[in-house]
């Protein structure tokens, strides 16, 4: 009986052992599939370091920034974060809304999280590095040269956004630097840089292409951080999706403003959060060459009062093709306070020690500019009362030159910039730019502001309607011991010094017969541009002309170009003060509306050929297409 009972219980024991064995296997599988959090984080971080494009840089940014603080309800206004002091005139409620939080503060931040915020966990990095692609590649998913030329619809900023979205976020630009630049080796002890990108409803592709271009071209030893400042964008893709994308990028921070600041004050917001030695303000639609940052840092390290800029190349807003600047140029201005590029004068070119020597520039371009962070703050930063954007580069340049600093363009630093379609600029932007120019004139030009108002009647009218309050900036000038604008004209840009009275006629040049206006529609270098007729537009600087007391017709911007004649076609050439060429640039504007070329005795006529409406010299016969009129300019002598 006992033996029979033993055999009866043996199958039960075997079943129990098998059950324990199966349970153990299940627990082992669960442990393998779901490791502890710290083990998983170490594994993912190791894989990301192995495969990420940034792994080749010399130093690490430190602990990765895994969290982005963001509003739970994107429709609500953001609230400021605590512990962040205000800067100049920006109130705290205008400042912060989202920052990348270091991993070391993650638990503390989670404990303080309020009901209106949430923490977004950093997604896993991709295991494979995104390949860099060249122009015109024909692989699947890439854009060939023929496809780049295919027309796409424009977005509100005049950008081919659909085409841009098809171009890789990481692509190699053609090498356009001077061979001597490639022989330069940066110092190991350069200052660090904070690159600040401000955007408002920027295209997703151009924004991130700018970010990746910086990360791919700058050694980590020199890049402290990239700070993205969202100036109240409304596009949904630039909200949570951007926060989550930025959380994957080491060294990239995201700030959000709860009010529309404009590019000028948004840059100031980014500057308050920057920790690098040097501030680099860059538009959010740029692409950088390798080695673009090191020359900027090196020049600032040699003199902390230098304001420096790279050579700005052109990325076509229609095709996204890259067009490098061929000749050395400097940034200048005219009496309407318009910025433009000018080929280096012969005496400046001869003074350069080499083709890669720094270029003294009267004005720095606004697209990319770098300066010492403490110098920027101690000299008053940007003018916080300027609206939106426009003219901030002039104010920065005048302040540098007149208050003990200098402005340079560095040929070995190259950055491509998308110059968006001018016609896409809103009337609000144009009004803000005009208002900013009035502030600059009242603050920095002194008695020469009268010359500005003579060249810009609309600015004169605005200054009479609303007198700007410039007391704070004038006090800043006295505190810094700044020089007068006369010193700038005598020592920095003597070519600008006014040498003649107000032009006899100015404004748009209307053709009576066709109802159109004289225009130059060339892109890029406009030297030799044939003059044509186009629909009249108050916003096109290319239609602003001046008939001077020397019988010249000056192109509005840049003003060093004049109407000339080549094979009886009216074109733009450099204004000439001596020699035979000057006679090709003399025009008599008669009371009957005809414009007579004095040397030939012929009249300027609008000639229609197929789809073109060009300007040619023809025998004077008084026909409607030879009748012209300039805009009427209100007198400003009573000021």
Swiss-Prot record:
Membrane topology classification: Single-pass type II membrane protein
Residues passing through the membrane, by range: 12-34
Keywords associated with the record: Disulfide bond, Glycoprotein, Glycosyltransferase, Golgi apparatus, Lectin, Manganese, Membrane, Metal-binding, Signal-anchor, Transferase, Transmembrane, Transmembrane helix
CDD domains found in the cross-reference section: beta-trefoil_Ricin_GALNT15, pp-GalNAc-T
InterPro entries attached to this UniProt entry: GalNAc-T, Glyco_trans_2-like, Nucleotide-diphossugar_trans, Ricin_B-like_lectins, Ricin_B_lectin
Glycosylation sites: 107, 574
Tissue expression pattern: Widely expressed. Highly expressed in small intestine, placenta, spleen, cerebral cortex and ovary. Expressed at intermediate level in uterus, mammary gland, stomach, cerebellum and whole brain. Weakly expressed in fetal brain, bone marrow, thyroid gland, thymus, heart, skeletal muscle, lung, liver, colon, pancreas, kidney and testis. Not expressed in leukocyte. Expressed in both normal and osteoarthritic cartilage. Expressed at low level in chondrocytes in all zones of both normal and osteoarthritic cartilage.
Domain Ricin B-type lectin: 504-631
Cellular component, GO annotation: Golgi apparatus; Golgi membrane; transport vesicle
Broad class of where this protein is predominantly found: Golgi
Region Disordered, residue ranges: 106-155
Domain notes from UniProt: There are two conserved domains in the glycosyltransferase region: the N-terminal domain (domain A, also called GT1 motif), which is probably involved in manganese coordination and substrate binding and the C-terminal domain (domain B, also called Gal/GalNAc-T motif), which is probably involved in catalytic reaction and UDP-Gal binding.
Protein name: Polypeptide N-acetylgalactosaminyltransferase 15
Organism: Homo sapiens
Gene: GALNT15
């Amino acid at each position: 009986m006992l033996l029979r009972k033993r055999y009866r219980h043996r199958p039960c024991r075997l079943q129990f052992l098998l059950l324990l064995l199966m349970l153990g296997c299940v627990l082992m599988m669960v442990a393998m599939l779901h490791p502890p959090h710290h083990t998983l984080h170490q594994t993912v971080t190791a894989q990301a370091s192995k495969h990420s494009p940034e792994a080749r840089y010399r130093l690490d940014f430190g602990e990765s920034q895994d969290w982005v603080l963001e509003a739970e309800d994107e429709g609500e206004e953001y609230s400021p974060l605590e512990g962040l002091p205000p800067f100049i005139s920006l109130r705290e409620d205008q400042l912060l809304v989202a920052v990348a939080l270091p991993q070391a503060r993650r638990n503390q931040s989670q404990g303080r999280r309020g009901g209106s915020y949430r923490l977004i966990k950093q997604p896993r990095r991709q295991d494979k590095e995104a390949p860099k692609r060249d122009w015109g590649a024909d692989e699947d998913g890439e854009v060939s040269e023929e496809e780049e030329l295919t027309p796409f619809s424009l977005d509100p900023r005049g950008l081919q956004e659909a085409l841009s979205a098809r171009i890789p976020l990481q692509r190699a630009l053609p090498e356009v630097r001077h061979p001597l630049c490639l022989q330069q080796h940066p110092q190991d002890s350069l200052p660090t840089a904070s690159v600040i990108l401000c955007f408002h409803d920027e295209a997703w592709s151009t924004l991130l292409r700018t970010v990746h271009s910086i990360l791919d071209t700058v050694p980590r030893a020199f890049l402290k951080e990239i700070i993205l400042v969202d100036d109240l964008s409304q596009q949904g893709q630039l909200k949570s999706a951007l926060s989550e994308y930025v959380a994957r990028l080491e060294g990239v921070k995201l700030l959000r403003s709860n009010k529309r600041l404009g590019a000028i004050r948004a840059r100031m917001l980014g500057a308050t959060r920057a920790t690098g030695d040097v501030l680099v303000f860059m538009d959010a639609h740029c692409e950088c060459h390798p080695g673009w940052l090191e020359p900027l840092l090196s020049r600032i390290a040699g003199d902390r009062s230098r304001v420096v800029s790279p050579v700005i190349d052109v990325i076509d807003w229609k095709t996204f093709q890259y067009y490098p600047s061929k000749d050395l140029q400097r940034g200048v201005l005219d009496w309407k306070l318009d910025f433009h590029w000018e080929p280096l004068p012969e005496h400046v070119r001869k003074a350069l020690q080499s083709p890669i020597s720094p270029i003294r520039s009267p004005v720095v371009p606004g697209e990319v500019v770098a300066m010492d962070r403490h110098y920027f703050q101690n000299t008053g930063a940007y003018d916080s009362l300027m609206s939106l954007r426009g003219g901030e580069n002039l104010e920065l340049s005048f302040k540098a030159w007149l208050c003990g600093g200098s402005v340079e363009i560095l040929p070995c630093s190259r950055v491509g910039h998308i110059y968006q379609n001018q016609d896409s600029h809103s009337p609000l932007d144009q009004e803000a730019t005009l208002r900013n120019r009035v502030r600059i004139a009242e603050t920095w030009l002194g008695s020469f502001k009268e010359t500005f108002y003579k060249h810009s009647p609309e600015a004169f009218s605005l200054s009479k309607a609303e007198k700007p309050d410039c007391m704070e900036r004038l006090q800043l000038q006295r505190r810094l011991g700044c020089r007068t604008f006369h010193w700038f004209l005598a020592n920095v840009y003597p070519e600008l010094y006014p040498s003649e009275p107000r032009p006899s006629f100015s404004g748009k040049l209307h053709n009576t017969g066709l109802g159109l206006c004289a225009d130059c529609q060339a892109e890029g270098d406009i030297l030799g541009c044939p003059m044509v007729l186009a629909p009249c537009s108050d916003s096109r600087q290319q239609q602003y002309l001046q008939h001077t007391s020397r019988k010249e017709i000056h192109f509005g911007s840049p003003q060093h170009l004049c109407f000339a004649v080549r094979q009886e076609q009216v074109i733009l050439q450099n204004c000439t003060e001596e020699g035979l060429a000057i006679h090709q640039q003399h025009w008599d504007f008669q009371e009957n509306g005809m414009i007579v070329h004095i040397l030939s005795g012929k009249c300027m006529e609008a000639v229609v050929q197929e789809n073109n409406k060009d300007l040619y010299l023809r025998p004077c016969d008084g026909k409607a297409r030879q009748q012209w009129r300039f805009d009427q300019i209100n007198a400003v002598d009573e000021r």
